[in-house]
Amino acid sequence: MTKLIFMGTPDFSATVLKGLLEDSHYHVLAVVTQPDRAVGRKKEIKMTPVKQLALEHGLKVYQPEKLSGSSEMVELMNLGADGIVTAAFGQFLPMILINSVDFAVNVHASLLPKYRGGAPIHYAIINGDKKAGVTIMEMVKEMDAGDMIAKASTPITDADDVGTMFEKLAIIGRDLLLQTLPGYLSGKIEPQAQDDSQATFSPNISSQEEKIDWSKSARDIFNQVRGMNPWPVAHTLLDGKRFKIYAVEVVNGAGNPGEIIEKTKKALIVAANQDALSLKLVQPAGKPKMSITDFLNGLGQKLKVGDYFGK
């Protein structure tokens, strides 16, 4: 039985961890995840999905603010683990830790060398890619630059957003890891080096990138909205206040960028630089998320054709 340390944080990681826990080839000695954080409008302290799953299985959980140089890292190095598996952990692993075990592999949600970094699924959708995927790779000092053990891909449809793709890729990543890890550990699978000249990067989404630029095409804004739903969420201004947009549909229409060109009891159409967008799911400042119909029956009643978003 291979003794593992698992490192991960969100639901994506928890899916991978669950697969390892259910596979009799592996014994998870401990789990490392990000510290509990305050989330949501009420700033409630919440544990990560990985911590929740680990506690349900009685596993030892470590939550260092920074792994490098921590007492937790020293403890981890003394556990006698054979290897480390990471999946969307959210911190760099010190080389001293990687070198203390026989192997260290990462489940990365992109088709490397494309989209190294912390937001690969977001950028795949924002950029209008037709497919996304998962790469199982060796851990090295450089971010997501290790040799590739296996890859698998799946289409991105117009109905997908970050939430749906995370769910799909978590399952693909779990299955790919469990299918290929035995062959990798036995030496039957030879890792392939990445072509660094083809590498692209997907850093965490900045607050500036969350803002909708209505002078872009409707298709580009559609991809931006999907590529930020359910987090960090694309937003614009309405009457000078932040207005979040979770879902839109591209429709025919013309007007000045950001201009409301059609309003009914059930629809609000906003012009982009090319075509227009029908808003579907929104969140006005200080209010919960709501359908466009609910918005138009409430706060949105005062809006009229010729009004603008983005101001």
Curated annotation (Swiss-Prot):
GO terms for molecular function: methionyl-tRNA formyltransferase activity. Attaches a formyl group to the free amino group of methionyl-tRNA(fMet). The formyl group appears to play a dual role in the initiator identity of N-formylmethionyl-tRNA by promoting its recognition by IF2 and preventing the misappropriation of this tRNA by the elongation apparatus. One of its GO terms (cellular component) is cytosol. It catalyses: L-methionyl-tRNA(fMet) + (6R)-10-formyltetrahydrofolate = N-formyl-L-methionyl-tRNA(fMet) + (6S)-5,6,7,8-tetrahydrofolate + H(+). Keywords: Protein biosynthesis, Transferase. Its EC number is 2.1.2.9. Pfam families: Formyl_trans_C, Formyl_trans_N. It comes from the Bacteria. (6S)-5,6,7,8-tetrahydrofolate binds at residues 110-113. InterPro entries: Fmt, Formyl_trans_C, Formyl_trans_C_sf, Formyl_transf_N, Formyl_transf_N_sf, Formyl_transferase-like_C_sf, GART_AS, Met-tRNA-FMT_C. This is Methionyl-tRNA formyltransferase. Belongs to the Fmt family. The lineage of its organism: Bacteria, Bacillati, Bacillota, Bacilli, Lactobacillales.
